[in-house]
Amino acid sequence: MTSVNNNMTSRRNLVLREIKRQILWAWTDPKSYRMSVGAIHALRTAFECYMNIIMTDCAIMAAHGKRKTITDRDIAFHQYIKPFYLPRY
């Protein structure tokens, strides 16, 4: 059980590290700046809220299609219609 939790934690950290790297690359050389713990925590919180909204929308789409499982079609459709409606966030 512990190895499963450690594996999930390391995957989460890899995703967060990739997001942080992309944000720093967008503005400047990432090696010249560092992020504080509070900034990383805020970034993680914002990312989790964003993903929660996407998954909730996809669950509604799956329920509309009389399914209980979110498929890649739901996520692709969400990305397609995202520019056409005002975001809730």
UniProtKB/Swiss-Prot annotation:
- What GO cellular component entries does it have? nucleus
- Using the record for this protein, list the coiled-coil segments as residue ranges, or answer none: none
One matching Pfam family is Histone
**A Gene Ontology MF term for this entry?**
DNA binding
Task: Write out the similarity annotation.
Answer: Belongs to the histone H3 family.
UniProt protein name? Histone H3.v2
Species in which this protein is naturally found: Dictyostelium discoideum (Social amoeba)
